[in-house]
């Protein structure tokens, strides 16, 4: 004959919970997540602000460890990567001769993606306050200006075709001179593009590879 009754407690029919509604740790985690939902981080790129909303932050959460949340690092990286970088992109340069030419090169703004992901993750896990806060990202390289042209109005222009060099300061031509760049026939060509000024030195003889 079958059992007429069963004691569900003794039969082990209930899952044993480790966290209960009066858990202080659970309450603290709930408060933290509510702060995230009501927070906004504004990434500042010059005059432009890129908002990171609490809703987006919450969508990155994959779990928790104690009162700290665990974030999906791939999603954090996807948000951060390449935002408003100018290094390596094509930009228009107005030459001293009055022409507009397109140039590229390593000079410009470039985010340190790994550094910013780590800093942003630490900031979020440390606990955000409610409301808005502005943030400057971690950069691997910076430029003179956030607006284009990002090299500003103080720079040196080298005209490889005309073999002439110009120096502009605050937008004014303050010096110019003829120059000799690398010998293309001997494969000593001077690379075209936009670069940072590495160093300045007088009376230096430049020699190519032997």
Where are these regions (language model features)?
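Surface-exposed, secretory/extracytoplasmic low-complexity segments enriched in Ser/Thr/Asn/Gly/Pro
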Residues: 1-210
């Amino acid at each position: 004959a079958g059992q007429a009754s069963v004691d569900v407690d003794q039969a082990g029919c209930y899952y044993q919970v480790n966290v209960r509604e009066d858990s202080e740790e659970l309450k603290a985690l709930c408060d933290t997540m509510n702060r995230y939902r009501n927070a906004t981080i504004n990434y500042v790129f010059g005059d432009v602000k890129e908002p990171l909303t609490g809703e987006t932050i919450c969508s990155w959460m994959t779990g928790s460890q104690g009162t700290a949340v665990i974030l999906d690092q791939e999603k954090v990286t996807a948000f951060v990567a390449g935002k408003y970088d100018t290094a390596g992109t094509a930009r228009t340069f107005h030459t001293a001769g009055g022409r507009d030419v397109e140039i590229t090169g390593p000079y410009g703004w470039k985010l340190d993606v790994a550094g910013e992901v780590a800093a942003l993750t630490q900031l979020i896990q440390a606990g955000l306050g409610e409301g808005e806060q502005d943030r400057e990202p971690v950069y691997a390289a910076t430029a003179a200006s956030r607006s284009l042209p990002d090299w500003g109005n103080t720079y040196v222009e080298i005209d490889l075709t005309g073999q002439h060099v110009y120096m502009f300061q605050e937008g004014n031509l303050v010096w110019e001179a003829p120059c000799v760049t690398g010998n293309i026939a001997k494969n000593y060509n001077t690379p075209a593009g936009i670069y940072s000024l590495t160093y300045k030195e007088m009376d230096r003889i430049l020699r190519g590879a032997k």
